[in-house]
C-alpha cells in the first residue's frame, strides 16, 4: 500500500492554525499541540492513582469478547496501564457497522501517536478508545452509506425500528433479524469480491454472538485493531460508572460554578471570532436514566428536574443517587471530557475537527475541578484512492487536492462546455447581453412612467429567462450525449467528495474491507503512519 501526505487549501483554518501555533487558538487550550515541549511536560506529569482500578475495569469490559480473545498486545497494554503507563485517548459514537470511516481513522490516530510517544520518550504509552455508549441520539448511529459501483452513486442504509429508543445506546438491544436484513442490504450494493463472503460471515457472527448495540460495535473494532494493542471501554459500563461516583457528586455540588465557567469560556471563544460549538440549555450538564429514558437534568433554584418526566429531586436526594447508583448518571458534551481526564492519565486527547472546537470551550471547566486539560490533537484525516479513480483523475486532468476540497462540479461544468459549440454559447450569451442593453435603452425612453417601467422590466425578465433556458437545455443535451463521462465524474465525486465532504465522513469501513480484504487494516498490510496535521492519501 502506498501512502503520501498532501497539504490542502482548507476552508476551515482551525487545524492549520493549530499546526502553526497561532496564539489566538493555542490560548484556548492548556497546551500547544504543535510543540514537542508540551508532550515532554505531559509525559512527566504525576499520575492520579486510578490506573490500576481502570485496568481492572477495562479487562472486565473486554472479557466478553467471544469471536476472538484479547491479543497478547492488548494483554500487555492492560498490564502497562495497571503499572502506571499514560494513555492517548479518543472516542466515538457506536455507528452502524463501524460508522463512518473516520472512526477507524481516529483509532489509527491514537495508535500512531501512542507509538511515536513510546518510541520518543522510552515510556510505554497505551492507546485507549472510548465508546460513547452513553449517547441516546439513536438517529445519529442507526444508518450508514454504501457506494454502489454499478450505479456510480451512494445509498443510505438504515436500521429501522418501530419506535426510536430514548435510552442510552449501550442499553439498546437491536432486533437481530432486522439488523441482518440491514447488513444484507449493505452487501447487495457492494460489488462482489473474493473478500465478500468472508467479511459477511464475520459480521453475521458478531450479530449472532452479541446482544447490545455497543457490544457489536466493540466486537467489530476488536477484530480489526486487536493486533495493535488498542484497549476499549464503554462510557456506560457499570463498573466504570462506580469509579466515577465521586466526580458525579462534585459536579452536582458545583453545577452552577461549572455552568458559569463553561459559559464564560464559550463567550471568550466567540470574542476571538469563533462560532459557539456547544449548544445546551442545561445548567447541570448531566443526564439521569429514569423510566427507561435518558433524561437531561436541570436546576430551577430549588430542585433538580428531569426533562421528560418532570420528576424533581432535592440536592441531598440526587447526590444520594450519585453515591449509590452512579450507573444511572451519564455526562453531556461539557462534562464528558472532564470525566475522561479525571479517570485517565492522558498525554493527549485525539478528536475530530468539531470535537477539538468543543474542547476549546472548556478550559475554565477543567480549571474549576483542578483537572488539567491534556494536549488536544486533531485526528489524522485519510482518503483511500483506488486505481480506477486515479486513472479517471488523470483522464480528465483533475488535481486530487482540488477534488478533496471542492469536489468535481467546476471541472464537470468546464468539461461540458468544452464539448459544446463555442459559437453557439457565445451567440446566446451575446443575445443576453444585447437584451440587457436594449432593456436599458427602453427604460431611458419610459423614464418617469412607473407602469411602463414595470412593463419593460417584465418583458426583459421573460427574454432573459428564455435565453437562460435555451442555454441550459443546450448544455443538458451535451451532458446527455456524454453520459459515460458524466457517470465517471459522478464516480470521482462520490468516492472522493461524497455529499460535499471528505470520503471518511460518509463511507463505511466495510466498503474498504470488502474491496481490499479483511486484513487491509492489519499491521501486516496497512502502511505505517506518521502523525501529521495534513491530509493522508492511501492507495490500497
Swiss-Prot record:
Keyword set includes Coiled coil: yes
InterPro entries per record: Bacillithiol_biosynth_BshC (IPR011199), CC_BshC (IPR055399), Rossmann-like_BshC (IPR055398)
Coiled coil feature spans: 425-453
EC number: 6.-.-.-
GO molecular function: ligase activity
Keywords: Coiled coil, Ligase
Keyword Cell inner membrane: no
Top EC class of this enzyme: ligase
Function: Involved in bacillithiol (BSH) biosynthesis. May catalyze the last step of the pathway, the addition of cysteine to glucosamine malate (GlcN-Mal) to generate BSH.
Recorded family membership: Belongs to the BshC family.
Name of the protein described by the UniProt record: Putative cysteine ligase BshC
Amino acid at each position: 500500500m502506498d501512502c503520501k501526505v498532501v497539504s490542502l487549501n482548507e476552508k476551515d483554518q482551525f487545524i492549520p492554525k493549530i499546526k502553526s501555533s497561532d496564539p489566538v487558538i493555542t490560548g484556548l487550550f492548556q497546551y500547544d499541540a504543535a510543540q514537542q515541549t508540551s508532550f515532554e511536560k505531559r509525559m512527566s506529569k504525576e499520575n492520579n492513582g486510578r490506573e490500576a482500578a481502570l485496568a481492572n475495569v477495562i479487562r472486565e469490559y473486554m472479557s466478553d469478547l467471544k469471536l476472538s480473545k484479547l491479543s497478547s498486545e492488548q494483554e500487555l497494554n492492560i498490564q502497562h496501564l495497571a503499572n502506571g503507563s499514560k494513555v492517548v485517548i479518543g472516542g466515538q459514537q457506536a455507528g452502524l457497522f463501524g460508522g463512518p470511516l473516520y472512526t477507524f481513522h481516529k483509532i489509527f490516530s491514537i495508535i500512531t501517536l501512542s507509538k511515536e510517544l513510546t518510541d520518543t520518550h522510552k515510556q510505554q504509552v497505551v492507546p485507549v478508545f472510548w465508546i460513547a455508549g452513553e449517547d441516546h441520539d439513536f438517529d445519529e448511529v442507526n444508518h450508514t452509506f454504501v457506494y454502489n459501483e454499478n450505479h456510480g452513486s451512494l445509498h443510505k442504509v438504515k436500521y429501522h425500528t418501530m419506535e426510536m429508543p430514548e435510552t442510552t445506546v449501550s442499553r439498546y438491544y437491536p432486533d437481530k433479524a432486522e439488523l441482518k436484513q440491514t447488513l444484507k442490504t449493505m452487501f447487495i450494493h457492494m460489488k462482489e469480491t473474493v473478500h465478500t463472503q468472508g467479511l459477511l460471515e464475520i459480521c453475521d457472527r458478531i450479530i449472532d454472538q452479541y446482544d447490545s448495540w455497543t457490544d457489536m460495535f466493540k466486537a467489530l473494532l476488536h477484530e480489526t485493531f486487536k493486533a495493535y494493542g488498542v484497549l476499549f471501554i464503554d462510557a456506560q459500563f457499570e463498573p466504570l460508572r462506580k469509579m466515577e461516583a465521586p466526580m458525579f457528586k462534585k459536579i452536582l455540588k458545583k453545577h452552577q460554578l461549572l455552568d458559569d465557567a463553561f459559559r464564560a469560556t464559550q463567550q471568550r471563544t466567540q470574542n476571538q471570532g469563533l462560532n459557539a460549538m456547544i449548544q445546551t440549555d442545561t445548567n447541570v450538564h448531566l443526564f439521569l436514566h429514569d423510566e427507561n429514558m435518558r433524561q437531561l437534568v436541570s436546576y430551577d433554584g430549588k430542585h433538580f428536574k428531569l426533562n421528560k418526566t418532570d420528576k424533581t429531586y432535592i440536592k441531598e436526594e440526587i447526590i444520594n443517587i450519585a453515591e449509590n447508583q452512579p450507573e444511572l448518571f451519564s455526562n453531556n458534551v461539557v462534562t464528558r471530557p472532564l470525566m475522561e481526564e479525571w479517570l485517565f492519565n492522558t498525554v493527549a486527547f485525539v478528536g475530530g475537527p468539531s470535537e477539538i472546537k468543543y474542547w476549546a470551550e472548556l478550559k475554565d471547566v477543567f480549571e474549576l475541578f483542578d483537572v488539567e486539560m491534556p494536549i488536544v490533537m486533531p485526528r489524522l484525516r485519510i482518503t483511500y484512492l483506488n486505481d480506477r479513480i486515479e486513472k479517471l483523475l488523470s483522464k480528465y486532468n483533475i488535481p486530487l487536492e482540488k477534488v478533496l476540497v471542492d469536489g468535481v462540479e467546476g471541472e464537470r461544468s468546464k468539461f461540458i462546455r468544452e464539448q459544446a459549440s463555442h459559437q453557439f454559447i457565445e451567440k446566446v450569451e451575446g443575445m443576453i447581453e444585447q437584451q440587457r442593453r436594449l432593456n436599458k435603452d427602453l427604460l431611458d425612453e419610459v423614464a418617469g412612467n412607473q407602469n411602463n417601467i414595470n412593463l419593460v422590466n417584465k418583458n426583459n425578465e421573460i427574454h432573459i429567462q428564455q435565453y437562460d433556458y435555451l442555454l441550459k437545455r443546450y448544455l443538458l443535451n451535451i451532458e446527455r450525449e456524454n453520459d459515460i463521462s458524466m457517470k465517471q465524474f459522478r464516480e470521482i465525486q462520490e468516492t472522493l467528495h461524497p455529499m460535499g465532504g471528505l470520503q471518511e465522513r460518509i463511507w463505511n469501513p466495510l466498503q474498504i474491507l470488502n474491496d481490499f480484504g479483511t486484513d487491509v487494516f492489519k499491521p501486516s498490510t496497512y502502511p505505517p503512519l506518521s502523525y501529521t496535521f495534513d491530509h493522508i492519501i492511501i492507495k490500497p
